[in-house]
Amino acid sequence: VDQFIQDGIRPRQIGYFSFTKKAATEAATRAADKFGLDAENDLAFFRTLHSYAFNQLGMTREKMMGFEDYKEFGEKCGIPIKTAKFSESDGTFNSDNEYLTIINTAAVKRMDLLEYYDSRQNILDIERNTLYLLAEELKRFKKEKGLKDFNDLLEDFIAKEKHNKFEV
């Protein structure tokens, strides 16, 4: 980043994407301090991919799946869900429900759900048909409520026709 700024590339033409919010913030702070920049305005594209997609798609927190939404989904489907949330710092998903974990992991790996299921050595008592039905029901639930999860954000962003053009 230092070299690009020294070479005259405008800070807003630099896209710096990290896995964690902490790393993006640290990089922006260092560059801002070193070059006398405003981290928030001049280095607006120093962020996580999830944060960038969220911003570019004009999302709001209310449109994102939260714990209460997962809890409601679990109650509707008759599956216990005590924990289910995406980390705001790095977009990772954490759930005590193995079905949701498998559904999310397949999405992250961009694998077909049943192919991913078949590739695992399923030590836990996870039924293939139940997994498929829950994944379909989760899609329907999110669509009916107008909600997205972090994986949906990335997919929607990739499908978006217009993107910012960065020098680096």
Segments and roles (model prediction):
Residues 1-62:
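P-loop NTPase Walker
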Residues 4, 74, 142-143:
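Hydrophobic alpha-helix position signal
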Residues 13-15, 85-168:
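Accessory N-terminal region flanking or inserted into the helicase ATPase core
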Residues 31, 74-77, 160-162:
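Alpha-helix C-terminal capping segments
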Residues 39-42, 48, 67-74, 136-139:
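SF2 helicase/translocase NTPase motor core
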Residues 66-90:
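Conserved phosphoryl-transfer catalytic core
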